[in-house]
Amino acid sequence: NSGLLDELPALKIQFSHFSGGIGRFLGRIRGFQQRDKWGTAAIAGHGRRPKHPFDHYLEQRLFYDCAGWAGPDHAAEWGAEWVRFGLQEVALSQTLFATDYPQAVRDADEVAGYVAAVRALGPDARAMVDGVSAERLIPDLKQRVRKSS
């Protein structure tokens, strides 16, 4: 809430690993936006007001990927659970599909199992795997991918 997103209106930020589970902290973050209630409105570093409510930036400018489940074992089971929780907390429009391959997960079968398990979560998860949200972050993504292949 420094005003940076207002100063750079085209800037979009992508955080990895659901930003460490940001969905669990959204209520707290929203609460801290109430500067008058907290008595910080008169403090220079805290008193600057953004042009829009916090959720505007959350829904339009901040993106999160779903990598970072737990490591190489049980990628399908634990990875899909991580994505399921994440999609309950962060809008599909802001969630990008990702894996930890080849870092934490080095086995192609584990990755394939993870992808299948995520797709099985339902239409939102399938849309995420298919890149619907990524197209919001990266303009002309499909055209760029076609050119590079």
Which functions belong to the PLM regions below?
Residues 1-61, 77-93:
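Histidine/acidic residue-rich metal-binding segments in metalloenzymes
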